[in-house]
């Protein structure tokens, strides 16, 4: 019995690769590349690394993109609704957190997603913007599309301003 994490990982990877399908290997490579990107400082959070999330934030708008791969598929092989909610939260929350004064951050207090369509295309794109900027509460909205411009969902969310925790 191997007791180190590295040994357990090596054994598990060997077992997985012995029985892997091409899709298993695609997913594993995707996830390992995400961890590698985090180690290289490209991502700060594992969720962003695992999803290969890329964001662009302007003062009043944001755009977050993730590739559509089997990692995010549901049982009918389209992006899972929870992933669509996650990318919307990242676009809105990332924009909200950048708008508050130094020493503060935001937490999501409510999110609502209305799903409109599915896609089998290559990329999810979430575009966030402000509806209301208060001292303690921010209200945001977001459109989620694929790379062809097909609207997949719309989301709204509320964020509460909190003092940033000391690391």
Predicted regions mapped to residue ranges:
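Terminal targeting signals and extreme-terminal segments of soluble enzymes
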Residues: 1-125, 131-167
């Amino acid at each position: 019995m191997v007791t180190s994490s590295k040994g357990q990982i090596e054994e598990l990877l060997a077992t997985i690769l012995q029985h892997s399908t091409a899709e298993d290997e695609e997913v594993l490579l995707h996830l390992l590349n995400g961890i590698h990107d985090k180690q290289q400082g490209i991502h700060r959070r594992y969720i962003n690394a695992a999803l290969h999330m890329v964001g662009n934030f302007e003062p009043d708008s944001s755009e977050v993109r993730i590739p559509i791969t089997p990692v995010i598929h549901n049982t009918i092989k389209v992006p899972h609704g929870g992933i669509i909610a996650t990318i919307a939260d990242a676009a809105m929350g990332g924009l909200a957190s950048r708008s508050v004064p130094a020493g503060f951050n935001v937490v999501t207090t409510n999110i609502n997603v209305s799903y409109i369509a599915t896609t089998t295309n290559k990329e999810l794109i979430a575009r966030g913007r402000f509806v209301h900027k208060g001292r303690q509460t921010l209200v945001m909205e977001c459109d989620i599309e694929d790379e062809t411009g097909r609207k997949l969902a719309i989301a709204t969310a509320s964020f509460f301003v909190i003092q940033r925790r000391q690391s």
